[in-house]
Amino acid sequence: MRLARGIKYAVIGAGVALFGVLFGWVMFPAILKSQLKKEMALSKKTDVRKMWEKIPFALDFKIYLFNYTNPEEVQKGAAPIVKEVGPYYFEEWKEKVEIEDHEEDDTITYRKMDTFYFRPELSGPGLTGEETIIMPHVFMMSMAITVYRDKPSMMNMLGKAINGIFDNPSDVFMRVNAMDILFRGVIINCDRTEFAPKAACTAIKKEGAKSLIIEPNNQLRFSLFGLKNHTVDSRVVTVKRGIKNVMDVGQVVAMDGAPQLEIWNDHCNEYQGTDGTIFPPFLTQKDRLQSYSADLCRSFKPWFQKTTYYRGIKTNHYIANMGDFANDPELNCFCETPEKCPPKGLMDLTKCVKAPMYASMPHFLDADPQMLENVKGLNPDMNEHGIQIDFEPISGTPMMAKQRVQFNMELLRVEKIEIMKELPGYIVPLLWIEGGLALNKTFVKMLKNQLFIPKRIVSVIRWWLLSFGMLAALGGVIFHFKDDIMRIAIKGDSSVTKVNPEDGEQKDVSVIGQSHEPPKINM
C-alpha cells in the first residue's frame, strides 16, 4: 500500500510540474500572442480600431519661432542672429474620416483631420500669440527662389511684381504677429492693376490654391498651419489592417491610390513603414522600426538605443535623425544627383511641398557644423531637439514620443532683385515644431490590466506549480523508498571495533543482533 501511495504522489507531483511548464512557458505565451494578434489588428469594433480612428486624448503640438534680431545687417550679408520664441502650445486632436474597409486585400482607406487649440497657459512665459516676430518673408522668398530656379529669364518681371504685391519692401523680412503667420494668415495684396503683379498673382492663385485662402477684394491670406486646422486632408491614405498578418498592421501601401511616389529616385519613392499612429506587436531590439511621413514625403527608420521604463513599464527607446543624404546609400536617391545633395542633416523639400524649403533637426542638431557657423544663437541638444520614441515591445504601443523637425529657407542672393542682391546665401531657420505623445495614467493602467497583470499572475502560478510539483514528486520518491533510506542511514551509522587486550584501553563496541549474557560468578 505504501509503495502504491508513494508512486502516486511522485506521478501527481511530476504531472503538476509538467503542467506548470507547459502552461506557463508554452500554452500561455501562445494564447497571449494569439489574442494580441486579434486585438492589435484594425478589425471593426476593437478597442485598438476605435483609438486608431480617433485618438481619445490630445497630443502635444509645440511651435518655436526664430526671431531675427539683426535684419539690417543680414540685408548687407552678415550672419543672422536669432532668438528662439516659444513654445506656442497647442492641443492637437487627431481623427480619421471617410474610412472604408477593403476585405479583398485586407486594407483600409481614410483621410485625416487634425484640430488645434491654442493653450496660452501651457505656452512659454507671457506668450499670447500676439508677439511681433521678425523673420524672412516666407512667401516673398519662395516666389523669388522658385522663379530664379525655374524661370530665370523672368527675374526682371519678378522684381516689379514683388514691389507691387508687397508695397516696395525695404528688405526680405516680415514683421508679423506670431498667430498670423501660424494660423490666421498674412495678407498678400493682389488687388493690383499693373501687369507684373497682376500676372504674378494669377500664377500664385493657380499654383498655391491649396495653401492660400482667397479673401474678398482680391486679397490672399497665407499661413503655415491655418489650412491644416480642422480641415479634411485632401490625400487618401491606404494602409494594411493586419487581420491576415498582424505584422503588416498600419503599413502604408498607397497614397491617393498610387502605390509609390514619383518625385524621388529608385526606392526613395516607396512607402515604407506604418502611418505613424499604429505599430506591429512583438518588437525586438533588432527590429528597425519604420514610419512614413506624408508631410515630408519620406520614411523614417528609428534605431534602438537603450532599454528604459515609462511609468513602471519596460520599454525600448528609439532615436532618429534627418540623415546624411550625400553619404548614406539608402538616402542618395533623395538627391537629383550626388553633387546636388544638401549639407548633412538637411533635406530638400522642394519636390515634396512645392516650395523651396529644407527640413532639419531643431537647431541644426546632427547637421553639418557649417550650418551653426552661419547662424548665431542656436544651441543643439539631443534631449531637447532629437527624435525620441519609447515603445512597449510586446504590444507595439508608443508610450512616449517626441517627433521634432525644423523648417529652413535659403537667403538666396539674387543680383537682379535690389533687396536680395547682398543677402548672405545661407540656409537659415524659420521655426521648429514638436509633436508629442505621453500616455497618461489612465491608459497606462489599461495596458497594465490587460497585458502585464495577467502575465505576472501566470508567472507566479507557473513557478508555484513547478515548485509544488517538484516538491510533491520528491516527497513521493522519498515516501516510496523510506524503508530503504532508513536502512541505509542506520547501517551507515553502525560500527564494530575489535578489542585488543594489549592496548590496555577499552574501546567502544557496538554489536547489532546479539543478546548480552550476564557474567558467570565462580563460588
Swiss-Prot record:
Keywords annotated in UniProt: Cell membrane, Disulfide bond, Glycoprotein, Membrane, Olfaction, Receptor, Sensory transduction, Transmembrane, Transmembrane helix
Bilayer topology: Multi-pass membrane protein
Entry-listed glycosylation sites: 67, 229, 440
Entry GO MF terms: scavenger receptor activity
Transmembrane segments: 11-31, 459-479
Tissue expr: Localizes to both male and female antennae but not the leg, wing, gut, head, or thoracic ganglia. Detected throughout the sensory epithelium, associating with both sex-pheromone sensilla and plant-volatile sensilla. Differentially expressed both among different sensilla and different neurons within a given sensillum. Expression coincides with that of several other olfactory-specific proteins that are involved in odor detection.
Chief place of localization: membrane
Disulfide bonds: 268-333, 297-352, 335-341
GO BP terms in the entry: sensory perception of smell
Topological domains annotated Cytoplasmic: 1-10, 480-523
Subcellular localization(s) per the UniProt record: Cell membrane
Intervals, Extracellular compartment: 32-458
Keyword Transmembrane helix assigned: yes
Purpose of the protein: Plays an olfactory role that is not restricted to pheromone sensitivity.
PANTHER family: SCAVENGER RECEPTOR CLASS B TYPE-1 SR-B1 (PTHR11923), SENSORY NEURON MEMBRANE PROTEIN 1 (PTHR11923:SF69)
Similarity comment: family membership: Belongs to the CD36 family.
Designated name of the protein: Sensory neuron membrane protein 1
Protein's organism: Manduca sexta (Tobacco hawkmoth)
